[in-house]
């Protein structure tokens, strides 16, 4: 009979023990090795006493998985999922189950990282390339990005691109047609204010009356009207105006492409291609432009290159445009995008194929025709006389219609001017039209859907003018015409998945990325219809479950960060930075100090920081770091004093980007505050703070939190992410608001930074579950274990590689940096060689050349077991032995396992391999662990230079299949 208590048998800490990799005996063994008695002792050795919290978090106790699921199920049931006809960029969709199960709910897809290591990411790179092809085909333009965050932020990016490339250099006006979605205009205005642009809003036809650098039009507009802009666009382009268009992706299946009308840039949401509404996100935006604007495109772009064997290989193209390289001169601060959702949308297009998409789009349009015909037959007046899916109605008794709609559990769109809008979608069926007739007309309307349909078939539909009917073929590439059976689709998805290395195969030790476990129990609620199928603009009393979840999560984040308020809206870390800096900017303006526009940034900062500062209209001044990588206090004091009159803020990361807790962080905060500035603390490394210290306690004023790092939202192969910001009380009135949804906060009337009021709300249940299951003690122990794992790896590797930075007591924080520059000097072996060789050992490489060129930054999260850590350490030790053979001349510098890595099946089958000075076994089975669980890269090292010099960013030509 066991002597355990009932409390012990209930195992409330079971999730904690499953989330943390090393078990108690392994932890003790590791503690003994690093020279600490306990996790608390190790914490005391690492974290400066001056910033250590004296009290535990007040989140509550941990709970079991079943208990957590039951609680969040209760929240979900509080949501009332009405049939939505609101539209405005968010629509019901049918997620094909083959995609739901094999992509959205598959860790092989959702736990991968951004494909910086393309040799082990060919699967999702192909899926993203398909997304780009879909985007180009439907818009009629030349080059597409891999995705942006949402339609509204894509509009802001389009405005910025227009200013960069327009030949109307003296113009400072961006025109926005007055019939765009209101949330799009909201986000554009917010961004324009930072850039100093003037936004003029008016009827589309009036655009030619202004001196513009760019203009934005909606196709179809928010009332559903479809307009042929060909002549207007020609007139604008003749005046050097960059024409941008927000377009509906489903409508483009049937409509003439904006590119063929003369648009320069076309963007929109891909949500209705098989991605749930999710109360606002996450969704991928598409962004497509003319080839001449390619160097000014925001976001990532996938291109076709070749590997060392001359085979086709995919990679991220033109990376020199991005923020991590160009910093404040970058086109955008975009880092995380929406790759998982872009992949879902691309698979949706592949699964349905061009004919299937035409059938879906035609069905939606037919239902809109039937609805319009029935209403007009009863004397109802329509605002629009053309449409794809949206009917706008005037002259109704709005209160009566709304009452009947709510009674029928449906949401219509009610504009302030009395117009009632109805947007139909893929989920619409015949009985929905009957129900809409009853809601709009009242009972006894006498209309018959079948009869109306027969009438339309006989007379022909006039809803899409003949001049606007698409005549060119779409999606003619074989990929979109092969996989319409579920068997073939399932195998295609699996074939791509098998080319990629994700967390479900091995540890991904990327520094500054926190690739921790995304537990299955955390992911389960995401696809529940109560969370997945809610429209972000539905009445808030229908979203009580979401509201409570967001309030609880926000209160927990307030507790964790030491701030006073949280804004959930930013839908990426980069957006969080932008939102936080905007709050600082607005705060200074409220005090009559709008001239404060200088942002101090240490030279070691991530490139997103200066890019975000530039986006917020600030001027960047770089401060020096000392030889230990710390902020140089004397230089900071001098710079702060020099720019004191105009100092807006400083952006710092903590622990610092070089992986240590700087002892002087409070002094840094004090220096900036003394000169009238605010402190922005980048939350990228929050995984080393939770439960031990906090930004608010340290002295910062605002931070963003990467929920896709610290709080367990998966990286999705390059998104989604969430970047909510925490702020001190004095900044709370200046966080983002929203033009459509106003929950009654002081910040309601502020400009938005994202399309939806709560950002990518659909993935918030993941972080809610993570915090709920771990509780106060579990969160702290997770942080402490992350420190233990990092110091264990650091000490083991320090016997073979120099460790570049260490903090107090010779410790690191949650990551360590090994210096490969001496190795490169002695042997010619580069950090790239080591990164690619790790692929042969079954590992994704650590972060390369950040924050110091010629280094690797390693972050082993708390979720990795000692067994996996040792396997990684053994691989690095083995690689060091291989380097020694190059140093000794045993292997030539240009023909060795590192230089030739990664190795593929094709390599070892090639008879020419015999000429290499190492064996096939050394090439592909360099360790015993690999023999039992081999990951095979499918391409050799990719030629980056060739890919950029021969830019090709679409599916390979048909001739490649002949």
Swiss-Prot record:
Cofactor(s) the protein requires to work: pyridoxal 5'-phosphate
Gene3D superfamilies tied to this protein: Aspartate Aminotransferase, domain 1 (3.90.1150.10), Type I PLP-dependent aspartate aminotransferase-like (Major domain) (3.40.640.10)
Enzyme class: oxidoreductase
Catalytic reaction equation(s): N(6)-[(R)-lipoyl]-L-lysyl-[glycine-cleavage complex H protein] + glycine + H(+) = N(6)-[(R)-S(8)-aminomethyldihydrolipoyl]-L-lysyl-[glycine-cleavage complex H protein] + CO2
Record's GO cellular component terms: cytosol; glycine cleavage complex
Residues bearing PTM N6-(pyridoxal phosphate)lysine: 709
Classification via InterPro entries: GcvP (IPR003437), GDC-P_C (IPR049316), GDC-P_N (IPR049315), GDC_P (IPR020581), PyrdxlP-dep_Trfase (IPR015424), PyrdxlP-dep_Trfase_major (IPR015421), PyrdxlP-dep_Trfase_small (IPR015422)
GO MF term list: glycine binding; glycine dehydrogenase (decarboxylating) activity; pyridoxal phosphate binding
Pfam families from the UniProt entry: GcvP2_C, GDC-P
Keyword S-adenosyl-L-methionine: no
EC assignment: 1.4.4.2
Keywords: Oxidoreductase, Pyridoxal phosphate
Domain of life where this protein originates: Bacteria
Disulfide bonds: none
One Gene Ontology term from the biological process aspect of the record: glycine decarboxylation via glycine cleavage system
Residues annotated as signal peptide: none
Assembly description: The glycine cleavage system is composed of four proteins: P, T, L and H.
Protein family: Belongs to the GcvP family.
Biological role: The glycine cleavage system catalyzes the degradation of glycine. The P protein binds the alpha-amino group of glycine through its pyridoxal phosphate cofactor; CO(2) is released and the remaining methylamine moiety is then transferred to the lipoamide cofactor of the H protein.
HAMAP family associated with the record: GcvP
Name listed for the protein in its UniProt record: Glycine dehydrogenase (decarboxylating)
Species of provenance: Shewanella oneidensis (strain ATCC 700550 / JCM 31522 / CIP 106686 / LMG 19005 / NCIMB 14063 / MR-1)
Taxonomic classification: Bacteria, Pseudomonadati, Pseudomonadota, Gammaproteobacteria, Alteromonadales
Gene: gcvP
